[in-house]
């Protein structure tokens, strides 16, 4: 990650040269320590306009999001995923406005409850997936089963986050936070992602039934 840190230093020197860039924040995998050589740099800058720029800096792709305070505040209230922009960020410079947004994000995250309609939509999708998986297993169609697993794993993860009353994070962060989910299926991550086709299918079916019907032996911690 040394290349990323050198590129970050180059970028922040340029951004800090302008007083208009009042807050500068590092987001993404570099911020929460899960970056690899192919990871981008993702920065948020609070200023007086909304814009975006992307460039390669010392061989590292960098994306910089420029936003007004009001734009970010509105997004926090309209897009639950936006809270993660603040929960796992690293502040480089702040005039106080970013701190206000971060505090609001923490409050929204702690009070978040998945809307009933959202849960119903997820379960409608997953119930259909369950029937398709069962049909593929009955006919021993491994190719069809594997296809269903690959195209529906993300929806299962959405369901697990929703059942735990957490906004669904961006995909890279979602993987990083899987251990924070209360899921009463032993070694479910390994079985769902690394098992044989049969093991993956069995695990997905168990998770779907847990998500959509919350079977009596399963409970979710509240709070």
Summary of predicted features, one role per range:
Residues 32, 93-94, 170:
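Generic structural "secondary-structure junction" signal
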Residues 53-140:
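Conserved NTP/Mg2+-binding pocket subregion across the NTase superfamily
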Residues 1-38, 44-90:
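Metal-dependent nucleotidyltransferase catalytic core
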Residues 2-3, 23-25, 45, 101-107, ...:
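Short hydrophobic/aromatic-rich motifs at helix boundaries and adjacent loops
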Residues 11-12, 30, 111-113, 152:
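A short alpha-helix capping/helix-coil boundary motif
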Residues 27, 33, 38, 42, ...:
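Generic alpha-helix signal with a bias toward terminal, lower-confidence helices
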